[in-house]
Amino acid sequence: YMIHIADKVGAGEGLMGVILAVSAFTELPAMALFPRMHRRLSLRTLFRVCAATFVLKDLLFWVARSPVLLYVAAVIQFFEFGIFLPACVYYVAERLDSANQAKGQGLIHVCSNGLGPAVMTAIGGRLIDSAGINTMLMVTTAAGFAGFLVVLAATSRYLDKGDQGK
């Protein structure tokens, strides 16, 4: 839906391409730095940062009236998927025995990169067609906030192995 978001701020295809490129580019350093981040921060904290950033990015897309906020939203992808993807790998490696790690990775990625996005893409498309891009972005922000609350609840008792709540 990035083309609709770019159109909303008066830009077009060129901005859409740049925003997507910046988003993808910022994930790489986050992934490379993840082992160092994880030495300092628990997976609980890292998952919470990711969840908060998902909400912030959706909110920035929703309230954006100029390309500047879209660039900011693209840069914070560092804290979103750039941390989320390696955090999932570490979580599975720490929590499952080696015989079940491939299944664990598969399940996480089917939910986070397959089934969930497929369902939400269909809903988002319907919302854009029936109510417009701003309504879709409002719903996305609300859904992201609900997801953030789920992450907070799910991680409230979680401690990394050997971690005393860092």
Protein language model regions, located:
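Short amphipathic helix-loop junctions that connect adjacent transmembrane helices
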Residues: 1-16
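Helix-to-loop junctions at the C-terminal end of transmembrane segments
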Residues: 29-43, 128-129
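Intracellular juxtamembrane helix-capping segments at the cytosolic ends
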Residues: 83-97
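Structural signature of the two symmetry-related core transmembrane helices
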Residues: 45-60
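Loop-to-transmembrane helix entry/capping segments in MFS-fold secondary transporters
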Residues: 13-14, 96-109
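A membrane-interface helix-boundary motif in multi-pass transporters
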Residues: 126-146
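Multi-pass alpha-helical transporter architecture, strongest
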Residues: 141-166
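Helix-loop junctions at membrane interfaces in 12-TM secondary transporters
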Residues: 60-73
